[in-house]
């Protein structure tokens, strides 16, 4: 058993690893783990909600090619715009727009044959035909991701696993987590928003909408 005396002790090992260290630091004085007299260490665990949608944008076909590495994600960012609106979920989310002519995977996320099959065009080819298809679709896909705030609930928590240890023999965490209806409704709102934006860009949505089942 070790002890340290200091005016302030800061443990910054990330959310879950910090809880793991504290919960594993049991002693006669701290039977519940260090700093856990409230029995709340590891509780109210929460993460971002997230959803994504992609679309093929015909107006972006056959455009002049140049390097777009680094454009997308947090570089094209829309903060929450519906503050104080009446919605069926609390909090909000932001949008991250991505796509463009970047490496790898041709810059559009799928190989040209998958696009040709999706649009009912001739599949296959090599040489000049394949090169033309790659250039035609290159940079023509746009995706939108949403990242939102979930509600912290006491029922979502991590605790020390009584049966599993890491390679050093130190007990690991096990997790108890479930989404509430608020997060599910937020994800539905995300997808509705993404589809509205992409369809107003004359985009053709790719793949099935998440959560249809």
Question: How would you describe each model-predicted region?
Answer:
Residues 28-30, 152-154, 201-205:
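Short helix-capping/linker segments at secondary-structure and domain boundaries
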Residues 12, 24-25, 48, 163, ...:
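Generic, well-ordered alpha-helical scaffold segments in large soluble proteins
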Residues 9, 148, 182, 186:
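Conserved aromatic-histidine-acidic binding/catalytic patches
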């Amino acid at each position: 058993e070790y002890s340290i005396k200091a005016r302030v002790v800061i443990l910054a090992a990330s959310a879950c690893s910090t809880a793991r260290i504290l919960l594993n630091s049991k002693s006669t004085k701290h039977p519940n783990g260090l700093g856990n007299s409230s029995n709340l260490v590891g509780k109210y665990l929460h993460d971002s909600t997230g959803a994504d949608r992609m679309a093929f944008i015909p107006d972006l076909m056959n455009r002049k090619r140049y390097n777009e590495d680094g454009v997308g994600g947090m570089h094209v960012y829309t903060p929450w715009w519906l503050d104080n609106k009446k919605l069926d979920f609390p909090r909000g989310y932001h949008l991250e727009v991505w796509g463009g002519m970047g490496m790898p995977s041709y810059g559009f996320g799928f190989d040209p044959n998958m696009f040709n099959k999706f649009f009912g065009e001739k599949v296959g080819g090599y040489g000049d035909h394949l090169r033309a298809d790659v250039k035609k679709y290159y940079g023509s896909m746009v995706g939108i991701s949403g990242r939102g705030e979930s509600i912290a609930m006491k029922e979502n928590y991590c605790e020390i696993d009584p049966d599993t240890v890491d390679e050093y023999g130190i007990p690991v965490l096990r997790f108890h987590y479930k989404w509430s209806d608020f997060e599910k409704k937020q994800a539905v709102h995300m997808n509705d928003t993404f589809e509205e934006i992409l369809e107003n860009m004359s985009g053709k949505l790719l793949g099935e909408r998440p959560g249809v089942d």
